[in-house]
Amino acid sequence: MENFDITLLQNIAYIFAAILFITGIKMLGKEATAQKGNVISAVGMFIAIIVTAINIVNPFVVLGGILLGAFIGSVIAVKVKMTSIPEMVALFNGFGGLATFFIAWSEMSNTNDNLFQYLLVILTIYIGGVTFSGSLIAFGKLSERLKIGKGHLLTNLFISIFYISLVSILAMLVLPMIGSLPLNFETIFYVYLALVMLGGVGFVLPIGGGDMPVVISLLNSLSGI
């Protein structure tokens, strides 16, 4: 027992959490089991968070964040009308993308000479940022708060920014492969962050409200990745 490694217990908990999460997502596909599936997925996520944070930060801080998030989410979910569920899903998914964005950003300083970790962080930042800003646009369109047509000047502008953001992520991924990072890399990185956020707007803005459920599903899948 003296040689018992706590990481073994953590890995078992991760596997159990993953099984719960995947099972819950599968149950969401049927109306009869959707509610139970949502609860099972939430339990799986809760276990994963606790196991991950137990050796990293003060557990009381983690517990406080969980309780605060659960309270805010519950209040919003209770008050929302059934016809507004798609907007709520888009909004909650966007917050998940924002969390991913900030977590990846915080890891940027730890990449150092680890090329794989650098590539992973750059890609995760893009996915998280596009998911967040794109989900906000989806929320605005579904709730009819945002009424900008496909041929609008702003729409065309943001579409162009979206294509620029695609070029920027390719450049950021290739940059360390062709040599050392430039001295002004920090400035380049901040420009990349801005392009990512604006790119998400350009990705969703030209899509009509009738296709928003498909867009939300896609963004949710990206967030899962």
Protein language model features and the residues they cover:
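N-terminal transmembrane signal-anchor/hairpin module of polytopic inner-membrane proteins
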Residues: 1-59
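Structural signature of hydrophobic alpha-helical transmembrane segments
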Residues: 4-18, 55-71, 117-132, 182-195
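Helical transmembrane-bundle signal
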Residues: 14-27, 45-52, 97-103, 107, ...
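C-terminal ends of transmembrane helices
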Residues: 20-35, 70-89, 135-149, 199-212
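Cytoplasmic-side transmembrane-helix entry/capping segments in multi-pass membrane proteins
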Residues: 35-44, 62-65, 84-96, 149-161, ...
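Helix-loop-helix hairpins and the membrane-proximal interhelical loops
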Residues: 40, 47, 146-194
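Transmembrane alpha-helix boundary signature
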Residues: 52-63, 75-86, 101-115, 174-181
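Interhelical loops and loop-helix junctions of multi-pass membrane transporters/channels
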Residues: 82-157
